[in-house]
Regions:
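General small-molecule cofactor/ligand-binding pocket signal
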Residues: 13, 88-90, 176-179
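Conserved Class I SAM-dependent methyltransferase catalytic core
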Residues: 17, 132-189
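Conserved SAM/SAH cofactor-binding pocket of Class I
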Residues: 27-101, 105-108, 114-120
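SAM-dependent Rossmann-like transferase core, predominantly class I methyltransferases
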Residues: 2-37, 43-50, 54-55, 192, ...
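A generic structural signal for alpha->beta connector loops
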Residues: 9, 58-60, 84-86, 149, ...
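Mobile active-site "lid"/loop adjacent to the S-adenosyl-L-methionine
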Residues: 110-137
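SAM/dcSAM-binding transferase cores
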Residues: 186-232
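Residue-level signal for inorganic ion chemistry
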Residues: 28, 109, 138, 196
Length: 232
């Protein structure tokens, strides 16, 4: 598919989006906790929102995104999917957006450049630069709009994890799941899947997982996680 990806139940076009479909988004969409009302913060192409809509068949899934082109394309992607009646995308900065009601779950693949260095592609730089969506703003929004029993799940680069988790703790959230993700057992951890709760969790889960098997294919863990999405 030119300028896009075909998954088992939907397709993603991305020619007007600064941030393209990647492993991070697929991981989060397949791993995150859900609920009846789900919000994707920085929804981009709509990939994660659509994965959540596929996994949680009764959920209303909304996305909020600052880039107008991405919002337009995510709406078109959603409109071609089987979940069109349960997906809504809003064009607004998170800091200024007021949803209609609280959410049971939030997901985010947040900007991760922690300095002001801008890439040549301004749209891509904005999508990836934490100056445009500081971690503090994500958690202050979640304090207002995440249900008391809700969960906030994210995927962040390993080097950004401490800053992200520190902000969560400062704003009263509890870490309930942490997966250290590496490509193979011989490679360093490159990204972290994290889940925070408003209430202190009864159990805490932490593990290290690999994306690739020794033969170069998907690992058993990654294959099981994404089997409902990737076309074989």
């Amino acid at each position: 598919m030119l300028n896009g990806f075909i998954f088992k139940e939907f397709a993603i076009l991305q020619d007007r989006c600064a941030m393209k479909v990647g492993t991070d988004g697929v991981l989060l969409g397949a791993w995150a906790r859900g609920g009846k009302r789900i919000l994707d913060i920085g929804s981009g192409t709509g990939l994660i929102a659509m994965m959540m809509a596929q996994r949680f068949r009764d959920a209303i899934v909304e996305g909020v995104e600052i880039d107008a082109d991405a919002v337009g394309q995510s709406r078109e992607n959603a409109g071609r999917s089987p979940f069109a009646d349960r997906l809504r995308f809003h064009h607004a900065p998170l800091q200024a957006w007021e949803p209609e009601a609280p959410f049971d779950a939030m997901v985010t693949n947040p900007p991760f450049f922690l300095n002001s260095l801008q890439a040549p592609d301004k749209a891509r730089a904005r999508a990836r630069n934490a100056e445009f969506l500081p971690f503090a703003n994500i958690f202050s929004f979640a304090r207002r709009w995440l249900a008391e029993t809700g969960h906030l799940s994210a995927v962040v680069p390993a080097e950004a994890y401490e800053a992200f988790a520190t902000e969560a703790f400062l704003q009263g959230f509890f870490l309930e799941r942490l997966y250290h993700v590496r490509s193979t057992s011989r490679k360093p951890v490159r990204r972290c899947l994290v889940s925070f709760a408003r209430l202190r969790p009864e159990m805490y889960e932490e593990k290290t997982v690999e994306l690739m098997a020794p033969d170069g294919g998907r690992s058993a863990w990654y294959d099981a996680l994404t089997e409902d999405f990737y076309v074989k």
